[in-house]
C-alpha cells in the first residue's frame, strides 16, 4: 500500500488558523513598531541626558515588607514581562491544543527549528569566549543570551521594509518565536535561579491551583482572578525563581476549549481566547515597549566607546550567536528534517526564503536583554556590553534579512495576491479550499 504523500514544508495551514494568526501578527507588528520607537528613545536618553536615565531606572518603589522594594528596571523586567509571558503561555497552549500544531507532525518542524536556533547560537557564544584570549572571567554564564527570538521586533522590521512574506513563513516565524520564548523561560528558571526558597514556592503552587480551578470553571471575575495571579507572581518572585515564570504557568493553565460541563467545544472557545484579546494589546502596546525603554538604554561613549564595547568577547559572542548562529541553527535543522522525512519545500518557496526568515529570527531583543541582565547584573561593564551586543546583533540580523527578503518581494506579492482570491465569494480564499 503506498504511503500518504508528504505534506510540503511551509505549506499553508487551515483558513481559520490563518485568519486568527493574521490578527495576532497585526497586533505584534504594531507592538514591534512601538518597540523600535522606545528603543531609540532609551538610547538617546541614556546618551544625551547625563545620569537622568540611570537615576530613573534605578529609582526604587514598592512595599519593602513584601520584599518588593524594586527598581523601575526590575519592575519592568519582573513585572511587565510577566504579562508578556502570560500571553506567550496562552498562545503556545492554543497552538498545540486547537491550532494547526496539534498534529505532532506539524509541530515537529517549528520545535526542532527552535531547538536548533537556540543550540547553535549558544555554542557560538561559548566558542568565542573560550577561544578569545581576552575573555573575562565568568563570561560563559551568558551563554543563553543570543538564543531568543523577538517576534514583535521582527514583524516591526518587516513592516518598515515592506516585505510581503508569505503567510506560511510568517506563521512559522511566530510559532518558532513562541516556542523560543517557552524554552527561554525554561532556561531562566533552571540556569539563572541561584537559590530556591521552598515555602513561598509551595504557596505559589497553591494560588496557581486556585487560579486553575477558577478558570476551568469559567470564572471571569477580575476581582478573583487578578488577586490570585498577583499572589502567584509575588510568591514565585519571593521563591527566588524569576517572576516571569509565573506568567507562563498562569497562561498554560487557562483552558483553550470549553469543557463538556459548559457546552463542549461546539459552544464556543474557552477562556484562553477571551484573555488573549484582553491582554495581548497590553503586552504588545505597553509592557514590552516599557521594558525596552528601561533595558535598552546603554551609554555608548562615542565611536571609541562603541568600538571597545563591541570588541568585548561577551558582546562578540552575542553578535555571532544572533547573526550567524540563528540562521545556521534554524536553516540547518530544517534542512536536516527535510532530508530525514524526504519532505520538499512548498512549490512557491525556495531555501533562500527560509534563510531570510531565519535571519529575522536573529532579532533576539526582549528575552535576550532579560537573560543578559540576569547573567551579568545591572550596571556592570559586561552587562552594558551584552546590551550593546544584543542591539548590534539584532540590527545586523534585520539588515541582512531585509536584503535577502526584499530580493524576493515580487514573488511574495504574487503569493499574497493568490491568497486573496475568493472566486466563489464564500469568504474563504480559494487556495484554502484545495
UniProtKB/Swiss-Prot annotation:
The gene is nhaA1. Its main location: membrane. Disulfide bonds: none annotated. The chain crosses the membrane at residues 30-50, 70-90, 108-128, 141-161, 172-192, 195-215, 286-306, 318-338, 354-374, 386-406. One of its GO terms (molecular function) is sodium:proton antiporter activity. This is Na(+)/H(+) antiporter NhaA 1. Belongs to the NhaA Na(+)/H(+) (TC 2.A.33) antiporter family. The keyword Membrane applies. GO terms for cellular component: plasma membrane. It holds the Pfam family Na_H_antiport_1. It is found in: Cell membrane. It comes from the Bacteria. Na(+)/H(+) antiporter that extrudes sodium in exchange for external protons. It is a multi-pass membrane protein. The lineage of its organism: Bacteria, Bacillati, Actinomycetota, Actinomycetes, Kineosporiales. It catalyses: Na(+)(in) + 2 H(+)(out) = Na(+)(out) + 2 H(+)(in). It comes from Kineococcus radiotolerans (strain ATCC BAA-149 / DSM 14245 / SRS30216). One of its GO terms (biological process) is regulation of pH. Keywords: Antiport, Cell membrane, Ion transport, Membrane, Sodium, Sodium transport, Transmembrane, Transmembrane helix, Transport.
